[in-house]
Amino acid sequence: MKHLTRAVRPLHVQAAPVAASAHPGALSRVPSAAAVDLPAPTPGDQVRLQALGSPPSVASVAVPPSLPVFVRRGSVLAVSGRIDRIVSAFVAPMWLRRLTLGNIVSRYQRLVATEPFAVLASASAPSLWPQLVRRATPRSFASLTLDGTADWAVLKRDALQVYAGPALTLSVHAAPQRISRRLAQSLNTSRIPTGLRRTGYTFVSGRGVVALAGHGSVYAARVAADEQLTVARSSIVAISVNGPHDLHNCVAQMPQTQASAAGSAGSATSAAGSNSRKWTDLKWKDVVPWVRGVWSKLVSAPRWGSGFVRVSGPRTVLLQSGGAQQMWEHTVRGPRSASAPKVSADYLNVVTFDQAHRPEIRSTSDFGEAVRAIEKTK
């Protein structure tokens, strides 16, 4: 019997460029730049976005005149420019569509000016109850530069932090629940579920810059053509797509492993055989395969459950390293410890000078006692 071997392209990890692209390649971090000063605004018609820090937790946006920039509410750290020339307003883009899909209705601060200015934004998102709930995992930026050749589907509901551009278009769509026929034929399967949540996603296209925030560090996994990448659904921040209806052509829910299927089939066969015979007729050699099949099903089924999806290339997937169980941490303020009551000696002090005119400070419980002691020294 001949054994066929298949070559598998290794997945390399290396430093990523400043901006993430949609071309296939290796697994890289997005981005890892050293913290620098806020760049001075320069005239022009192009908006510039730069992620700062390691990991990048701050984004600097240089905005030309008459071009609005949208920053998530509560994320603006500093503004460089003449404040009297900058107009600020709070908006909620596509709030009705997001509300119908069960998505997060985020408010953004819209900044526009008659002359160039720069904005410094933070990757942290505001919390509704900061005294009770705080984020346990820090957030970092992944900067995207769109030139019209590739679009992005932002799956994380709170990932869109900053966006601006002369021809940047944003829209909210419902996530497809079944894969396309073309993907089903390539996978040699039926139209299985995509594994995506029903809350929808934000489709970004056109020309401009976008800063996405993820928990932990954000990495770019570039999947080449005719290749697949199995990832946890909770770690996906965004996927590069070709149009607003391309997700069902590249994302499929990960089915159970073959070992799990074999185990379930073996357990079903054993169960059918056991029903046709009495329990007293069962032998040890019949019980062992049944127990082995049940154990294989219990162990293998959770390995590739509904929490994993397969992404088919060519495309780029942005992944966050922070797990879902680490995103929130409840903090309960305990009762304040009662401090000891203060006595008069804690806040009554007497200052005396010796013959060398050096001051001496000492505490006293009664000024009368200190005065009598001074009188005795005269």
From Swiss-Prot:
Q: Where in the cell is it found?
A: Mitochondrion
Gene3D superfamilies tied to this protein: Mitochondrial biogenesis AIM24
Please give an example of a GO cellular component term from this record.
mitochondrial inner membrane
Q: Keywords, A to Z? A: Mitochondrion, Transit peptide
Main location class: mitochondrion
InterPro entries recorded:
AIM24, AIM24_sf
Which family is this sequence assigned to? Belongs to the AIM24 family.
Name of the protein this chain belongs to: Altered inheritance of mitochondria protein 24, mitochondrial
Organism equals: Clavispora lusitaniae (strain ATCC 42720) (Yeast)
